[in-house]
Curated annotation (Swiss-Prot):
Gene3D superfamilies: Dipeptide-binding Protein, Domain 3 (3.10.105.10). One of its GO terms (cellular component) is plasma membrane. The keyword Cytoplasm does not apply. The keyword Membrane applies. Part of the ABC transporter complex OppABCDF involved in the uptake of oligopeptides. Keywords: Cell membrane, Lipoprotein, Membrane, Peptide transport, Protein transport, Transport. The lineage of its organism: Bacteria, Bacillati, Bacillota, Bacilli, Lactobacillales. Belongs to the bacterial solute-binding protein 5 family. This is Oligopeptide-binding protein OppA. It comes from the Bacteria. It is a lipid-anchor. It comes from Lactococcus lactis subsp. cremoris. Disulfide bonds: none annotated. Its main location: membrane. The gene is oppA.
């Protein structure tokens, strides 16, 4: 299975896969050497150091973490490991009688706050 076991050196040229990102801005689950979504089995010591730096205790300081992300992004751009071929947006239609609805990333209680302002169904 090429998704979990690295193929032979000459078995393939391109791997195409997709995933969605977690709300935690860590790239470990996508690009670390043992990541399940690292479909191309990319492994680079400099990127590994960058990933570990992003998630280190020092990165609890937002300024430090931002700088660590910038370095990681620069290194990833140099290596061109990932070439985006697709982009999508999520569309969530909500009518006027829905209250308490938010798609904000920081909202942790959406489903306990959402409701409707009327028992009467919306007609338009």
């Amino acid at each position: 299975d090429h998704m979990t076991t690295p193929p032979g050196a000459n078995d393939w040229d391109i791997t195409d896969g997709s995933w969605s990102l977690a709300s935690e801005p860590s790239q470990q689950d996508l690009f670390s050497a043992s990541a399940p979504y690292n479909f191309g089995h990319f492994n680079d010591s400099e990127i590994t150091k960058d990933l570990n730096d992003i998630d280190s205790a020092k990165s609890e300081n937002p300024t430090y973490r931002k700088a660590a992300f910038v370095k990681y992004q620069e290194d990833m751009n140099k290596k061109a490991y990932v070439v985006p071929t697709n982009f999508s947006l999520s569309y969530t239609p909500v009518n006027k009688r829905v209250v308490g609805m938010t798609l904000d990333y920081g909202a942790m209680d959406t489903w306990s706050e959402i409701g409707v302002s009327s028992a009467k169904l919306a007609t338009k």
